[in-house]
UniProtKB/Swiss-Prot annotation:
Localization (cell): Cytoplasm
Organism listed in the record: Legionella pneumophila (strain Corby)
Pfam family name, one: SecB
Gene Ontology MF term list: unfolded protein binding
SUPFAM superfamilies: SecB-like
Gene (UniProt): secB
PANTHER family xrefs: PROTEIN-EXPORT PROTEIN SECB (PTHR36918:SF1), PTHR36918
Stated name of the protein: Protein-export protein SecB
Family: Belongs to the SecB family.
């Protein structure tokens, strides 16, 4: 009887599985070479992140993390690298709020190290100094996004009610 209860408890939990991780798109540009190689190296990094999700089938989702890095050196673009790191994930038995968190925080945190490696590799191949992106707290970004949505919804509600 104990075994049956444990089995039922396990079935109530969300199940998560990585099916595949892959690069969907990769772009590398060095618009100001070779002049940028002659300058004193004083890089300024701009990092942009975006996540998109697509439901492919029942309980199967594609999550694409787009990471765009632009490095400026003395007010000129040294290089720009954009990678769309994707993954296909199976998620079963998750409540709506849990599913949203998995798709917009947990999955991107799985994809980011792969994107970071792809960016670092392209930068080195371009003969620039190694670029190591710091880890990103996707949970904090997700919570910030939820708060912004709640504030926007609250503002709409206030506008409608007045």
């Amino acid at each position: 009887m104990t075994e049956q209860l444990n089995t039922n408890q396990q079935n109530d939990e969300a199940q998560f599985m990585i099916q595949r991780i892959y690069i969907k798109d990769l772009s590398y540009e060095t618009p100001n070479t070779p002049a940028v190689f002659q300058q004193q190296w004083e890089p300024e990094l701009k990092l942009d992140l975006n996540t998109t999700t697509t439901q492919l089938d029942k309980n199967v989702y594609e999550v694409v993390l787009t990471v765009t890095t632009t490095v400026m050196n003395q007010k000129t673009t040294a290089f720009l690298v954009e990678v769309k790191q994707a993954g296909i994930f199976t998620i079963q038995g998750a409540a709506a709020s849990q599913l949203d968190h998995l798709l917009h925080s947990f999955c991107p945190s799985i994809l980011f190290p792969y994107a970071r490696e792809a960016i670092t590799s392209q930068v080195i191949r371009g003969s620039f100094p190694q670029l190591v992106l710091a880890p990103i707290n996707f949970d904090a970004l997700y919570m910030q996004q939820l708060e912004e949505k709640q504030k926007a919804t609250g503002a709409k509600d206030e506008t409608v009610s007045h």
